[in-house]
């Protein structure tokens, strides 16, 4: 089926990130062991609640203060927590602009309010997308079906007419179950090849 809309993941597709420096900075303000700190920080129950929007950033910060003895105030926590994002984009603005002129673009991301606030203030990438499906706003994390259902509904297109790219295999598998045309992201050049194979005239972008 002809592609009618294109869906992108955010982290590790559009913007690269690394938690190493942020984790070290947060750990430096704690009074527990590094192993225990990482257990607390990456507790799946709390991270998932945060990224589903069940708790806000201040509540997540309070949890870390109480459980990991984190000695850092909320504004500084937000600054450190958002320092994970690396400069530049993994997909060029030229490609995004080229696609935007021809297709509806939809962003589908597991994320949280602090990270999105930071990205809005420091990158232009969100402006290329017609709709944003953020996990903390819809109450669902990829690869759960609900977030994909929201994305399909937002597109107004049949799932088979959607092209979806994400770096994580489990999300690709979930999207494929809905019938989407999918590509596990590695590089921009491979994404362009996959778009071409799906019938998107991305070759014009390459030639231009």
Describe each PLM feature range.
Residues 21, 25, 45, 59, ...:
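Alpha-helical elements of Rossmann-like donor-binding domains used by nucleotide-donor carbohydrate transfer enzymes
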Residues 9-12, 53, 99, 107, ...:
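Generic structural signal for small/hydrophobic residues in well-ordered secondary structure
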Residues 1-4, 112-113, 117-208:
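Asp-based, Mg2+/Mn2+-dependent phosphohydrolase catalytic module
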Residues 7, 106-108, 163:
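Conserved hydrophobic packing residues within short motifs/helices of P-loop NTPase cores
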Residues 47-90:
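Metal-dependent phosphoesterase signature
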Residues 30-41, 69-79, 200-206:
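Short, surface-exposed acidic
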Residues 1-42, 177:
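Active-site neighborhood of HAD-like aspartate-dependent phosphohydrolases
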Residues 75-106, 145:
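Short, acidic loop-to-helix structural element flanking the phosphoryl-transfer center
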């Amino acid at each position: 089926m002809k592609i009618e809309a294109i869906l992108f993941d955010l982290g590790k597709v559009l913007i690269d990130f690394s938690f190493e420096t942020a984790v070290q900075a947060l750990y430096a303000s704690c009074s527990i062991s590094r192993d225990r700190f990482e257990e607390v920080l990456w507790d799946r129950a709390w991270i998932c609640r945060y990224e589903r929007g069940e708790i806000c950033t201040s509540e997540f910060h309070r949890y870390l203060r109480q459980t990991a003895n984190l000695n850092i105030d909320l504004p500084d926590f937000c600054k450190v927590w958002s320092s994970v994002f690396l400069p530049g984009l993994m997909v060029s603005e030229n490609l995004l602009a080229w696609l935007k002129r021809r297709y509806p673009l939809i962003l589908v991301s597991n994320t949280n309010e602090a990270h999105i606030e930071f990205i809005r203030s420091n990158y232009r990438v969100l402006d290329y997308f017609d709709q944003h499906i953020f996990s903390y706003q819809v109450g669902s994390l990829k690869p759960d079906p609900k977030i994909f259902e929201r994305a399909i509904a937002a597109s107004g297109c049949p799932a088979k007419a959607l092209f979806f790219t994400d770096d994580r295999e489990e999300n690709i598998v979930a999207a494929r179950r809905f019938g989407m045309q999918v590509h596990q992201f590695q590089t921009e050049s491979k994404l362009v090849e996959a778009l071409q194979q799906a019938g998107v005239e991305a070759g014009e972008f390459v030639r231009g």
